[in-house]
Design a protein with these regions (language model features):
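Rossmann-fold dinucleotide-binding core
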Residues: 121-190, 198-199
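Rossmann-like dinucleotide-binding cores of NAD(P)H-dependent redox enzymes
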Residues: 39-72, 161-171, 186, 193-201
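Acidic/polar active-site rim loop that often engages polyanionic ligands
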Residues: 32-35, 152-162, 233-234, 253
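NAD(P)-dependent Rossmann-like dehydrogenase/reductase catalytic/cofactor-binding core
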Residues: 2-8, 35, 170-173, 180-191, ...
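Rossmann-like NAD(P)-binding element
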Residues: 45, 49, 60-121, 129
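NAD(P)+-binding Rossmann beta1-loop-alpha1 motif at the extreme N-terminus of oxidoreductases
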Residues: 2-59
């Protein structure tokens, strides 16, 4: 019997693993594109919040006239929210969007390789984990591809497609075509530390932290310089707080460890803030202090 092949045409059901900020946005994009979508999240509260967040996002689209109420309901009808990874045993394509940890993602890819049919392409939304490490724990390295969506996934057009030397042209082309079908503008990146977007933004953030650390200027003026001088919507220190300083440190360490070049060494000030639990908006304190609703304190 001839083994089933994955083509864009026969992808009907997409599995999204992880219901955090990225996962819920990716699942919404998949369902809005017309795919039956299974979102897997083991934590009940996170799964519940993800569903509520998607409904709120769709409600907003209706209010703005971007979609009709009928479309809103059809999108939700295409979505299933599951607790167990075994629920992905009949999907045609997988996008993993779990926590940014090599060990966690390796365990997930081992499970996906066991659960999913052999023709299924396994993708990851990682922003910093080396794709080759994930491909190496599967029996299908040629079908492991990176799909790095930008935040928020339902709004941002760019998508980084990451391929390893083992990634087949067939798998790459399917992911590229799927990205375009989802309304994204894909760019192709090799399996290099932090790829393009994370590499550039983390270098930018780290240099801003060094400016603060070395007394070049105040945090407010560093951020103002980039907002008013370069037309950035957020200053680099505000952006770091928004991302989460623990996540920022993790990505910068991935860059430094990947290249072993001094220019990527994380600033000691960032390490100090993370060590004492000042992680940005999510903890109420980072470079700035925040209210419970995430707004910056005066």
């Amino acid at each position: 019997m001839t083994a089933k092949k994955t083509t864009l045409k026969n992808i009907k059901k997409i599995g999204v693993l992880g219901a955090g900020q990225m996962g819920k946005g990716i699942a919404q994009v998949a369902a809005q594109t017309g795919f039956e979508t299974v979102m897997v999240e083991p934590y009940d509260e996170v799964r519940k919040k993800a569903r509520e967040g998607i409904i709120k996002s769709l409600d907003r689209s209706v209010d703005l006239g971007k979609i009709k109420k009928k479309e809103h309901d059809q999108i939700l009808d295409r979505m299933t929210f599951a607790k167990d990874i075994e629920s992905l045993d009949d999907v045609d394509f997988v996008i993993e969007a779990a926590v940014e940890s090599t060990a966690v993602k390796e365990d997930i890819f081992k499970s996906l390789d066991r659960i999913c049919a052999s023709h299924v392409i396994l993708t990851t939304n990682t922003s910093s984990v080396r794709l080759g490490k994930l491909a190496s724990v599967t029996s299908r390295p040629e079908k492991v591809v990176g799909m790095h969506f930008m935040y928020p996934a339902q709004k941002m057009k760019l998508l980084e497609i990451i391929r390893t030397p083992a990634t087949s042209d067939e798998s790459y082309n399917i992911v590229k075509d799927l990205s375009i079908k989802m309304g994204k503008q894909p760019i192709t990146v090799t399996d290099s530390p932090c790829f393009i977007t994370s590499r550039l933004i983390q270098t930018f953030i780290n240099e801003a932290i060094f400016c603060l650390y070395q007394g070049v200027s105040s945090k407010e003026e560093i951020d103002t310089a980039m907002k008013l001088g370069m037309n950035h919507p957020m200053g680099p220190l505000e952006l770091a707080d928004f991302i989460g300083l623990d996540v920022v440190l993790s990505m910068q360490q991935a860059l430094y460890n990947g290249f072993q070049e001094p220019k990527y060494r994380p600033c000691p000030l960032l390490l100090s803030l993370v060590e004492v639990g000042h992680l940005g908006r999510k903890t109420g304190k980072g470079f700035y202090d925040y209210n419970a609703d995430g707004s910056k304190k005066d």
